[in-house]
């Protein structure tokens, strides 16, 4: 089961669109679920995600116009409970102790957060944490040189094989990270 994890698009305010090389990789009919950390910013970005998969879950980012997106969400995909937040609630941004507290409050196997615009994936206390980064490479308040990235999770029973796609220069680099539920 393929799950697309992305966020912080900031279209059209900080970027015009997803990189063309990412659009070629993201084709309708291959992905079953989309988990978005927010900051889509427009209905057009949401509509695009709906063309890729029927099951789209989005949380509200600090720049989203749609106030109907929830602040947080917990979804179950296969054997995994997955928590989804934008990440602007985590102070300081990306702080491990704050993320671990949210993971325990949500009682999830995987916590997905964004806001920093930088990809991260790691295990902590037998739980898995993912920040997909910014799919467009949009700048954040602290940095202008952001590497565009998104994540595909391939969920198979009690294992998640995570593929991070990063656009470095003109090349899409792919890294594989595996997490097994204890």
From Swiss-Prot:
Binding residues for Zn(2+) 2: 39, 62, 86, 115
Record keywords: Acetylation, Cytoplasm, Endosome, Host-virus interaction, Membrane, Metal-binding, Protein transport, Transport, Zinc
Pfam hit, one: Metallophos_2
A GO BP entry: retrograde transport, endosome to Golgi
Post-translational modification N6-acetyllysine, affected residues: 50
Effect of substituting residue 152 to E: Impairs interaction with TBC1D5. Impairs interaction with VPS35L
Positions bound to Zn(2+) 1: 8, 10, 39, 117
Tissue expression remark: Ubiquitous. Highly expressed in heart, lung, placenta, spleen, peripheral blood leukocytes, thymus, colon skeletal muscle, kidney and brain.
UniProt-reported outcome of changing residue 62 to A/N: Loss of in vitro protein phosphatase activity
Main location: cytoplasm
SUPFAM superfamilies to which the protein is assigned, alphabetical: Metallo-dependent phosphatases
PANTHER family: VACUOLAR SORTING PROTEIN VPS29 (PTHR11124)
Family: Belongs to the VPS29 family.
Name listed for the protein in its UniProt record: Vacuolar protein sorting-associated protein 29
